Design a protein with these regions (language model features):
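Metallo-beta-lactamase
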Residues: 97-100, 121-126, 131-221
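Conserved beta-strand hairpin/beta-sheet module of binuclear metal-dependent hydrolase folds
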Residues: 1-47, 136-146, 151
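Hydrophobic residues at beta-strand termini and immediately following loops
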Residues: 10, 109, 198
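Short Gly/Pro-enriched turn/cap motifs at secondary-structure boundaries
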Residues: 8, 106, 126-128
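A short acidic, often aromatic-flanked loop/helix-cap motif at beta-alpha or helix-coil junctions
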Residues: 15, 112-116, 214
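Active-site neighborhood of phospho(di)ester-bond hydrolases with catalytic His/Asp-centered motifs
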Residues: 29, 50-58, 64, 85-88, ...
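Active-site HxH/HxHxD metal-binding segment of metal-dependent hydrolases
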Residues: 34-121, 203-204
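Short, glycine/acidic-enriched loop or turn micro-motifs at the edges of active sites
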Residues: 23, 33, 59, 91, ...
């Protein structure tokens, strides 16, 4: 399947595109910034946008108001191409309120749902903590983690909808079964490298160090 996989990091790794090279179908992940340019970029590769996956509702991933600056994001993309926007069910109302994307454009998912883009499967994993409906996308040994997990650290848990206890459960349970050879691609580059294998991240990232929930919350809850 790897030979068919289309995988591209866009805009310094903030946005991603995944798809099937043989069918030319692609999904955009978190197209907040310059969505028309994102479409143009993958069309140069002879790919066509068939849908959007949002890891969570924040403006720098979905579009909306960020510190007084409005990011058109997904809403602008839908003005160019009418495609479904795949979100975790718990995130739907947050996405609509924050980004302005209408509910009719959203497809709500549960954890474990698999999207098909051509013959490529994209598994959606509910990973609450940073937001109620944060989700990661797992495709062909690559985990697109949004703001759930970074190579160094994890998403903030002091924002509207955040829950430190849920973040602990996400890191220690919901993502625990993923193979250590899985490549982590976070939604922000806060480390020297843009990606790392989960085995390395588990070894070096302090938020994944073995500790009880009480210890973790006392150390990282903020």
């Amino acid at each position: 399947m790897t030979e068919r996989l289309y995988f591209r990091q866009l805009l310094a790794g903030v946005d991603f595109a995944v798809g099937d090279r043989e069918t030319g179908d692609a999904l955009l992940i978190d197209p907040a910034y310059r969505p028309r340019e994102l479409i143009d970029a993958i069309e140069v590769d002879e790919m066509t946008v068939r849908g959007v996956v949002l890891t969570h509702y924040h403006a720098d991933h979905a579009g909306g108001n960020l510190a007084g600056h409005y990011i058109k994001g997904t809403k602008e993309l839908l003005e160019t191409t009418d495609v479904p926007v795949h979100v975790q069910a718990a995130e739907s109302p947050w996405v609509t309120e924050a980004s302005g994307v209408e509910r009719r454009s959203l497809v709500a998912h549960e954890s474990g749902d698999v999207l098909r883009v051509g013959q490529i499967g994209v598994t959606l994993i509910h990973t609450p903590g940073h937001t109620p409906g944060s989700q990661c996308a797992l495709v062909d040994g690559r985990l697109l983690s949004g703001d759930t997990l970074f190579i160094d650290g994890c998403g903030r848990t002091d924002l509207p909808g955040s829950d430190p206890a849920e973040m602990y459960h996400t890191l220690t349970s919901r993502l625990a079964d993923l193979d250590g050879t899985t490549w982590l691609y976070p939604g922000h580059r806060y480390a020297a490298e843009p990606t790392a294998q989960l085995g390395v991240v588990r070894r070096d990232n302090a938020v994944l160090a073995p500790m009880t929930a009480e210890q973790w919350l006392a150390t990282f809850s903020r």
